[in-house]
Structure formats: structure tokens, C-alpha cells
UniProtKB/Swiss-Prot annotation:
Subunit structure of this chain's protein: V-shaped homodimer. Interacts with CDC16. The mammalian APC/C is composed at least of 14 distinct subunits ANAPC1, ANAPC2, CDC27/APC3, ANAPC4, ANAPC5, CDC16/APC6, ANAPC7, CDC23/APC8, ANAPC10, ANAPC11, CDC26/APC12, ANAPC13, ANAPC15 and ANAPC16 that assemble into a complex of at least 19 chains with a combined molecular mass of around 1.2 MDa; APC/C interacts with FZR1 and FBXO5.
Annotated region (Disordered), positions in chain: 30-85
Organism: Bos taurus (Bovine)
List of residues that carry Phosphoserine: S42
Keyword Coiled coil: yes
Name under which the protein is recorded: Anaphase-promoting complex subunit CDC26
Record-linked PANTHER family: ANAPHASE-PROMOTING COMPLEX SUBUNIT CDC26 (PTHR28579:SF1)
Keyword hit for Cell cycle: yes
Cystines in this chain: none
GO cellular component: anaphase-promoting complex
Subcellular location: Nucleus
């Protein structure tokens, strides 16, 4: 295997501007979400993250990572296919 010299990375003005715009966008989204949480907090839903219910915690994690579990079928025909005996 050939070893090569490290590649030099240069920070350009365009990169800095892009970073700043993305950071500002994320900050505005965070503020909007906090505002919604404060308004929704009067209903008592603001403490969902502090809930000790394992189902809601699992559901929050699944929502965060984008996992949507599919229910498993319980009948035998779905386990073994449609075999005729």
C-alpha cells in the first residue's frame, strides 16, 4: 500500500458563509420549537421527555431516528407461506 502525504484543507469564504447560514437556520428552528414547547407546556405535554413510561421513551427514540416498526403477523399461514396440506 502506498503512503501519501496528508491533503491540505483550506477554509474558504464561501464555506464560512454557508456554515453561518446553516447555523442561523438551525437556531431559528430551535427557537421556534422552544416557543411551541412553551405554549404546549401549559397542557402538561412539555414533560414528555421526563416521563418514566418505557413505551413513550421507546416511541420518542423511534421517532427521533425515523424507525417505524411493522407489526409481526401471528397466524401460521403468514409464517410458513400459503402451503396447502
Amino acid at each position: 500500500m502506498l503512503r501519501r502525504k496528508p491533503t491540505r484543507l483550506e477554509l474558504k469564504l464561501d464555506d464560512i458563509e454557508e456554515f453561518e447560514s446553516i447555523r442561523k437556520d438551525l437556531e431559528t428552528r430551535k427557537k421556534q420549537k422552544e416557543d411551541v414547547d412553551i405554549v404546549g407546556g401549559s397542557d402538561g405535554e412539555g414533560a414528555i421527555g421526563l416521563s418514566s413510561d418505557p413505551k413513550s421513551r421507546e416511541q420518542m427514540i423511534n421517532d427521533r431516528i425515523g424507525y417505524k416498526p411493522q407489526p409481526k403477523p401471528n397466524n401460521r399461514s403468514s409464517q410458513f407461506g400459503n402451503f396447502e396440506f
